[in-house]
UniProtKB/Swiss-Prot annotation:
UniProt-annotated stretches for the region G4: 116-119
Matching Pfam families: KH_2, MMR_HSR1
Role of this protein: An essential GTPase that binds both GDP and GTP, with rapid nucleotide exchange. Plays a role in 16S rRNA processing and 30S ribosomal subunit biogenesis and possibly also in cell cycle regulation and energy metabolism.
Start and end residues of each stretch annotated as G2: 36-40
SUPFAM superfamilies: P-loop containing nucleoside triphosphate hydrolases, Prokaryotic type KH domain (KH-domain type II)
GO cellular component, one term: plasma membrane
Positions of the KH type-2 domain: 186-274
The UniProt record lists the keyword Glycoprotein: no
Keyword Transmembrane helix found: no
Protein name: GTPase Era
Main location per the UniProt record: cytoplasm
């Protein structure tokens, strides 16, 4: 029996969260086409042939001077120090530059490369990309094609990961899908609904805080604050006669209800907190990086 932690690293939009959901065959990680959708480390658990693999989905690696984005990158880098193996995820359409940047961070643990989105290309393109990575073969343990959509090569990827883990009893109850609290997952579903219902830039000025939860046998009651930075943005979140906020709430309720397996009463509020993205203490609280 083996058990260990795998940190999923890659640039924003490489498909890391989608890959986690495909391995779990459940929706746990926030998925969005927008960059930096993943803001907290999400730990998802996969049992593969009696071995326990704990995946840590991290914020994407990218270059940015913004305080918030710097903290996201620091969070991702720190996760590389706290794992047994790194899974570097890259789209088959990406150049090797992101991988070279990753190597420049001097990772101290073994890593595997997953070339994602191979269902969107042909064999010739895939083989060409594999040959481009071949010159780095001394650095990685294995490189495998992967399709989060079709779950192709799923067993092969998990087999390679297990090879890098140590013999160890389970760290968590094997019935768990994630060790993140349900409250954190609810928050991510609300944030995902914001991403899906608003324009490209506006969601980056927002965050979600769960204020209250009450769980009964047949009903889950949630109250949450959407934090934004200006009154004009607040108006955009609410929309004409509250239409936008209602749409966000409807989408989030559906996602949360599917996870909770019960009816959900969700109350959303919009609060203005100016310059929240530069408030380091507030950001550390959001990212669970408090000491």
């Amino acid at each position: 029996m083996k058990s260990g932690f795998v940190s999923i690293i890659g640039r924003t939009n490489a498909g890391k969260s989608t890959l986690i959901n495909s391995l779990l065959e459940e929706k746990i990680a926030l998925v969005s086409h927008k960059q930096n959708a993943t803001r907290r480390k999400i730990k998802a658990i996969v049992i593969h042939e009696k071995n326990q693999i704990i995946f840590i989905d991290t914020p994407g690696l990218h270059e940015s001077g913004a305080t918030f984005n710097q903290l996201l990158v620091q969070s991702a880098i720190k996760s590389m120090e706290d794992c047994d193996v790194i899974l570097f995820v890259a789209s088959v359409f990406d150049s090797t530059k992101d991988y070279e940047n990753f190597l420049s961070l001097n990772p101290q643990v073994s890593h595997i490369i997953a070339l994602n989105k191979v269902d969107l290309t042909d064999n010739a393109t895939l083989l060409k990309k594999l040959s481009e990575y071949a010159k780095f073969s001394e650095h990685f343990k294995a490189i495998l094609p992967y399709s989060s959509k079709k779950k192709s090569y799923k067993k092969g990827l998990l087999d390679e990961i297990v090879k890098c883990l140590n013999e160890h009893e389970y760290f968590y109850d094997p019935e768990f899908l994630s060790v993140n609290s349900e409250k954190e997952l609810y928050r991510d579903f609300i944030l995902e609904s914001i991403y899906e219902n608003l324009s490209d830039e506006l969601p980056y000025s927002s965050e979600v805080l769960i204020n209250r939860t009450k769980d009964t046998p047949n009903l889950l009651i949630l109250e949450a604050n959407i934090i934004t930075d200006t009154n004009s943005h607040k108006g955009m979140f609410i929309g004409k006669e509250g239409a936008t906020l209602k749409r966000i709430g409807k989408d989030a309720r559906f996602k949360i209800s599917k996870l909770a397996q019960k009816k959900v009463l969700l109350k959303l509020f919009v609060t203005v907190k100016k310059n929240w993205q530069k408030d380091e203490e507030f950001l550390k609280k959001l990212l669970n990086d408090e000491n």
